[in-house]
């Protein structure tokens, strides 16, 4: 029995050592993998629209940097990761990404050390629950405790800072366009076609300024990212600190105005009703102008719309400098005028004004298709 004891101890030690080795290898390739099984309600998220793209042949090779080896993830369906996110805030066109594209902070992109390029992932802000889809098109970050580097647009959508922990769940796109992977668990991705019905915009045209142009606005507004609304109690400045999805969307056909509609309008209406009851020849002409004056006040907003003054609001931030920078970048990118308007503690970023609502709707389409930006039409003040 004494001679067999060392053999048993050695065997047990080998088993323990093998178990430790297996755990270490698993942590290097997969961090907290989660199956793409939904056990709760399904939510719709927006962001970069996933589409099938062949892998970049030069950006998906294992490599070394600063003495550390990086192995490209071969099976994203078994990958999931959580950690701190960095914010890549370089100027547009100042850097070339690993995919060969010029870096653009206005795009919903991200850099990751080992995920395939190009690929897509669902990024979740673990502090507030916000989720968006980003396109992985670059490598990094290196030499830090960060697990992913987000573009400025993606960071603003998630409302992240340099101390925010996020979760990375890859989305796999098949050649037929079907989506799968950990990033699709309890999630559906909003398609751009849902937000861009061209026929309603064309039919709105130059027709009635009060009813016909309002229909495209109703079609566009439902895609505003409801999942980006924070449940915290810090109030409006927090929800508006992100560049996109920050403004509160309006009901279909309603134009935004900084001035509330005067409430005491129904009171003067009773005066013209009483005036015809007396029916003297001189009293009736006097009461008619009195009735016209109160009616003109609530119609003042449609009158402004009829004059052809519309703007497209793309966001609101709490910092004036950032708001002006975004407005200038968008104005340059889309060759349209723009302005920054203060509204309480936030600064609204608006493009325009435009002479017709059809022109504003056309810009909305370009913002969504070319920059994946959500917006709404408001009346120019």
UniProtKB/Swiss-Prot annotation:
Q: Does the keyword Cell wall biogenesis/degradation apply?
A: yes
Q: Which GO MF terms does the UniProt record name?
A: lytic endotransglycosylase activity; peptidoglycan binding
Lipidated sites in chain (N-palmitoyl cysteine): 20
What EC number(s) has UniProt assigned to this enzyme?
4.2.2.-
Q: Where is the composition biased (Low complexity)?
A: 208-218
Q: Please list which residues make up the signal peptide.
A: 1-19
Family of the protein in this entry: Belongs to the RlpA family.
Main function: Lytic transglycosylase with a strong preference for naked glycan strands that lack stem peptides.
Q: What is this protein called?
A: Endolytic peptidoglycan transglycosylase RlpA
Give the species this sequence originates from: Salmonella typhimurium (strain LT2 / SGSC1412 / ATCC 700720)
What gene does this protein come from? Answer: rlpA
């Amino acid at each position: 029995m004494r001679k067999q004891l060392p053999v048993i101890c050695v065997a047990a030690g080998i088993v323990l050592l093998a178990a430790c080795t297996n755990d270490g290898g698993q942590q290097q390739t997969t961090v907290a993998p989660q199956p793409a099984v939904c056990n709760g309600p399904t939510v719709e998220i927006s962001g970069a629209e996933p589409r099938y793209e062949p892998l970049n042949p030069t950006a998906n090779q294992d490599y070394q940097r600063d003495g550390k080896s990086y192995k490209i993830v071969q099976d994203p369906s078994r990958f999931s990761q959580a950690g701190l996110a960095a914010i890549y805030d370089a100027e547009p066109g100042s850097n070339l990404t690993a995919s060969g594209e010029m870096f653009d902070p206005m795009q919903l992109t991200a850099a990751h050390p080992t995920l395939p390029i190009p690929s897509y992932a669902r990024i979740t802000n673990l502090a507030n629950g916000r989720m968006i889809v980003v396109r992985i098109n670059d490598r990094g970050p290196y030499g830090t405790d960060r697990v992913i580097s987000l573009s400025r647009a993606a960071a603003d959508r998630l409302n992240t800072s340099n101390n925010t922990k996020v979760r990375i769940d890859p989305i796999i796109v098949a050649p037929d366009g079907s989506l799968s992977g950990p990033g699709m668990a309890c999630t559906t991705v909003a398609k751009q076609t849902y937000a861009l019905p061209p026929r309603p915009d064309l039919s709105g045209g130059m027709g009635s300024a009060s009813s016909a142009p309002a229909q495209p606005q109703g079609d566009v507004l439902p895609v505003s990212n409801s999942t980006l609304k924070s449940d915290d109690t810090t109030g409006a400045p927090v929800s508006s600190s992100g560049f996109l999805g920050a403004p509160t969307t309006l009901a279909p056909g309603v134009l935004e105005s900084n001035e509330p509609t005067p409430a005491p309008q129904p009171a003067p209406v009773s005066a013209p009703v009483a005036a015809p009851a007396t029916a003297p020849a001189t009293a009736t002409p006097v009461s008619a102008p009195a009735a016209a004056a109160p009616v003109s006040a609530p119609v003042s907003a449609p009158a402004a719309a009829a004059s052809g003054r519309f703007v497209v609001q793309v966001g609101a931030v709490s910092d004036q400098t950032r708001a002006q920078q975004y407005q200038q970048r968008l104005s340059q990118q889309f060759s349209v005028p723009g302005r920054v308007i203060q509204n309480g503690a936030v600064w609204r970023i608006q493009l325009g004004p435009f002479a017709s609502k059809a022109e504003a709707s056309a810009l909305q389409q370009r913002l969504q298709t070319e920059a994946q930006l959500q917006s709404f039409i408001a009346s120019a003040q």
